[in-house]
Amino acid sequence: MFGKKKKKIEISGPSNFEHRVHTGFDPQEQKFTGLPQQWHSLLADTANRPKPMVDPSCITPIQLAPMKTIVRGNKSCKESSINGLLEDFDNISVTRSNSLRKESPPTPDQGAASRIQGHSEENGFITFSQYSSESDTTTDYTTEKYRDRSLYGDDLDLYYRGSHAAKQNGHAMKMKHGDAYYPEMKPLKSDLARFPVDYHTHLDSLSKASEYGDLKWDYQRASSSSPLDYSFQLTPSRTAGTSRCSKESLAYSESDWGPSFDDYDRRPKSSYLHQTSPQPAMRQRSKSGSGLQEPMMPFGASAFKTHPQGHSYNSYTYPRLSEPTMCIPKVDYDRAQMVFSPPLSGSDTYPRGPTKLPQSQSKVGYSSSSHQYPGYHKASLYHHPSLQTSSQYISTASYLSSLSISSSTYPPPSWGSSSDQQPSRVSHEQFRAALQLVVSPGDPREYLDNFIKIGEGSTGIVCIATEKHTGKQVAVKKMDLRKQQRRELLFNEVVIMRDYHHDNVVDMYNSYLVGDELWVVMEFLEGGALTDIVTHTRMNEEQIATVCLSVLKALSYLHNQGVIHRDIKSDSILLTSDGRIKLSDFGFCAQVSKEVPKRKSLVGTPYWMAPEVISRLPYGTEVDIWSLGIMVIEMIDGEPPYFNEPPLQAMRRIRDSLPPRVKDLHKVSSMLRGFLDLMLVREPSQRATAQELLGHPFLKLAGPPSCIVPLMRQYRHH
């Protein structure tokens, strides 16, 4: 107590101190300045950017842990039209679009939720029930409150095939001939029952089949001569005493396996049903004009099967029509048995059947060669021993098929049998093993370190990492296999960037499986995305021409290879520090060929989507040209057309209205207007190709890459 006081420890000041990061806040702009890159990505406006969406018709079922049971209600929607549903878009936080979040969103307010029919909520998720006129089965929709300016295929699937197509009182609603631009396109119907972004995480959430009052869905062609005259009828219906099936698998025919132009019958074609009770709750009707006896399901529905232990597992099948006399059509294996080619099969031609996965095929008709994807890896430090010849690539589909089912055709369905075996499922382990065949062995962490997250997208996160030996920075895109809406699209990230190299395409070094994540190592472009420039600065016509020239060179190369990017926008254009422009984000691309000349899946980002994509018409490489035209408007006006409107409403405007225009036409030269008019043509066959646009006089205004550098300096000062 009275001892000698201890000497106070002296702490010296920092030595060799230097300010490397100078942060501040601009009160006029109300923005932070000088933030480090990883901080800026968290505070930037990119969170408000619309996310791309995919067609849910080919979502792959996998085995997942069950979520707690969601109880449904019987409320019906207040309004029948799509407008009543679009009102809620402005009230939803865009942060809910994050596909990598670890928790469920908070429970939405009851006022907004009451606009959606036949649902109740729990932890922010809404469960829907629709009653099909072709099937006395209850189909459960586990959905999440939709997000502002973030639209996925789940949303638009229901946007097309929704339960809101008629008034609450069940009166039929007809589309008039003048309601849409294309006389042959399908009407858009709005059901905004949104699936959560972590779609597979919630597919298996219902632990038992429930019996509730549902809605009877009557979809039929009207007797009018106009191809747009449909009648939609919803009538309340209860089936007391009728046993619901608790084991069922849903089959879709919204495939892109061939040039089928049946615009009216491209509906859910069949259901493969397992009954737990002896009474079959199934009706069949003959589709007009086809004589096909088949049950129907609402498109995009998730059919659940009850596991004996109470866990629910879902199963999907994706056959195409080939046997008009069967209740479940047989897959055309002449088309389905393809060498596993991810750009072709990974996007929207990945057929599945109730008892068999696709087999390998020896020929695929590409533009110049069979493109069986030899193991190409850039000769660099990133090179690791990998599969080098096409013969070493085992067909992923046949590999997965060999793990489960050996039969080559679909057996006839037994609607009343409770002992039928359940359709085969692709487990996570099987899918991971298939993906392992096309990536390189090894762990990139052996030669990379200092991982810093700089961005986040709908499929994964992006980090920068440093090569240990050279100090070179690379970008690493990390995608969790268990958190994808469509796992097959992950193959695009690997194969397209690996096999197609161009000066204006982001270079991929290698890809790996690290645990349950796909890691794609690619070049790091320090200049960031074009979005930063168009948002914070204004571009002159020389700079616009420079960007267009580089993007058109990349598109011309890809289109000649039969590759459709399907997500052209400023977010997909990256810049180097010296102003060079490169195309990136190939996760939503598709391959076309002589055998598969058109696509029909709903893929893209709403504001940039071409009218034919929204209208569900068969499309080709022309959709990228339309999206590029929208991106030109984005470079002129700072945002795409209709950007102040909710995604669905903007899509309806794109579908029904004349091509969008620049806000201030008087500020645009006649040469640029003419260039834009060649891209924003509603009729795809009249739209200019990338090669044709490369010869346009406007592109002669293009300057060197250095003319873009001042723009990067400007937005960094904001």
Swiss-Prot record:
Q: Subcellular location, in the record's words?
A: Mitochondrion; Cytoplasm; Nucleus
Q: Report the GO terms under cellular component.
A: cytoplasm; mitochondrion; nucleus; synapse
Q: Which UniProt keywords apply?
A: Apoptosis, ATP-binding, Cytoplasm, Kinase, Mitochondrion, Nucleotide-binding, Nucleus, Phosphoprotein, Serine/threonine-protein kinase, Transferase
Name the residues that bind ATP. Answer: 454-462, 477
Residues where Phosphoserine occurs?
Answer: 104
Q: Where is the composition biased (Polar residues)?
A: 226-244
Ranges of residues in domain Protein kinase: 448-699
One Pfam entry name: PBD
The record's active-site residues are 567
Reported EC number(s) for this entry are 2.7.11.1
Q: Which domain of life does the UniProt lineage start with?
A: Eukaryota
Q: What are the boundaries of the region Disordered?
A: 1-29, 96-119, 226-245, 264-296, 339-371
Q: Where is the composition biased (Low complexity)?
A: 359-371
Q: How is it modified after translation?
A: Autophosphorylated when activated by CDC42/p21.
- List-wise, which residues carry Phosphothreonine? 107
Predominant subcellular localization, coarse grouping: mitochondrion
Tell me the segments the record calls region Linker: 25-447
Residue ranges of the CRIB domain? 11-24
Notes on the domains: An autoinhibitory domain is present in the N-terminal region of the protein.
Q: Which PANTHER family match?
A: NON-SPECIFIC SERINE_THREONINE PROTEIN KINASE (PTHR45832:SF4), SERINE/THREONINE-PROTEIN KINASE SAMKA-RELATED-RELATED (PTHR45832)
Q: What is the stated purpose of this protein? A: Serine/threonine protein kinase that plays a role in a variety of different signaling pathways including cytoskeleton regulation, cell migration, proliferation or cell survival. Activation by various effectors including growth factor receptors or active CDC42 and RAC1 results in a conformational change and a subsequent autophosphorylation on several serine and/or threonine residues. Phosphorylates the proto-oncogene RAF and stimulates its kinase activity. Promotes cell survival by phosphorylating the BCL2 antagonist of cell death BAD.
Q: Which family, according to the similarity comment?
A: Belongs to the protein kinase superfamily. STE Ser/Thr protein kinase family. STE20 subfamily.
Report what the protein is called. Serine/threonine-protein kinase PAK 5
